[in-house]
Amino acid sequence: GQGGLAGWQWMFLLQGVPTVLLGGLAIYLLSDSFANAKWLGAHERAVLEADHRLDAASKPASSTDSLLAVFKNPAIWAFGLIYFCIQSGVYAINFWLPSIIKNLGFSDTLVIGWISAIPYLLAAVFMLLVGRSADLHKERRWHLVVPMLMGALGLVIAVNFATQPAIAILGLTIATMGALTGLPMFWPVPTAMLSAGAAAGGLALINSMGHMAGFLSPYLVGLVN
């Protein structure tokens, strides 16, 4: 460490200070509407405003968009639980994948690193393919459900074939592909179903519930391990 601060404290400062400064600048640099965006041309602005009106018209109308109404909305809590489950799988894999692979019988650090990279490489390809398919077919729900089922199935395979490294790694790969793809495929679903007024508080609550998994999931996996 330097200057009386430990290395991890410097890391927090170096990562946090630019973020806070950028957040302050965003107030002045970002426009609050299409009409005020100076970097958009007149035609681009008109197209975006038309799309925005169509999007708003397709969402359910609501006269109860208060914060209290958000907390009373069962759909928001259901979405929060779904997102919590997705994030639980993601955090568990991100934190524990190398350790799990080591417990399968691999001792060389380099080999563990290469094997750990396989699920993420395939997940990156799968994520692009699923996203492309969702846009092509204009469908979101099943493009979310299938990756989530893959994530659950992959973990079940990995657990039940822990004594067979090849099959266990296959299960972990399927789980990683499903969990990481579920993240980007999740958000269009609640965004499309919530009214404009409910979306702000609703999405914030869903996001907060999901990221509680970042605290709980690694501890739970470690406890089970």
Residue ranges and their predicted role:
Residues G1, L22, A26, P98, ...:
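Small-residue (Gly/Pro/Ala) motifs that create kinks and tight helix-helix packing interfaces
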Residues L5-L67:
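Central mid-sequence intracellular linker of multi-pass
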Residues G7, V111, E139, A198-L205:
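Cytoplasmic loop-to-transmembrane helix junctions
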Residues Q15-L22, A123, M148-L155:
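MFS 12-TM fold signature
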Residues S66-G131, L183, W187, G214-P218:
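Extracytoplasmic gate region of multi-pass secondary transporters
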Residues V125-E139, N225:
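Helix-to-loop junctions at the C-terminal end of transmembrane segments
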Residues L136-V189:
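C-terminal transmembrane helical hairpin of 12-TM major facilitator-type secondary transporters
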Residues T191-N225:
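A late C-terminal transmembrane helix in Major Facilitator Superfamily
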